[in-house]
Amino acid sequence: MGAKRVVPARELSLEEIQEIKDDTGLDMECFVHGALCYCYSGQCFMSSMLGGRSGNRGRCAGTCRLPFYLDGTKNTKNAYPLSLKDLCTIEHLPEILDHGVDSLKIEGRMKGSRYVGEVTRIYRKYVDLYLSEKPYKVESEDLKILMEVFNRGGFTGGYYKEYHGKDMMSMKRP
């Protein structure tokens, strides 16, 4: 087919991504920052059924970000049981790059220019530090900026290193 680069599903571990790269020789472009879907990548039908737009075709209606009341009341405590925290891998960049990831993908669709600019600037800074082969620690000010431009009750490292279960869920924020 002539493919040179693939974007693997966000649910894969770093070991699985490395295995695909080793087996195929293809470049890997991986999501490192942005929204995570409650469903497996490409398998969300909730957006189509409840929102009338296909999340599998880049038109997610964000139905997993709506409040759902599991106890039959409109109790707002934990009203967002399907809302995952956003992915933030800034502290795991060396491991991600060491596992053969060639290109980093930052969510920008339907985001403002401040979000895209700040997130890109911060990731660029730490990619450059990694490439300079100097050890570094992510500065608290940079983490604060990432939290301020957008988050859903904190961040998660996603599936790259381990499955985090309920720690990946926001519950209180859409």
Predicted ranges, named:
Residues A3-P174:
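Surface-exposed amphipathic alpha-helical tracts and adjacent flexible/coil segments at the periphery
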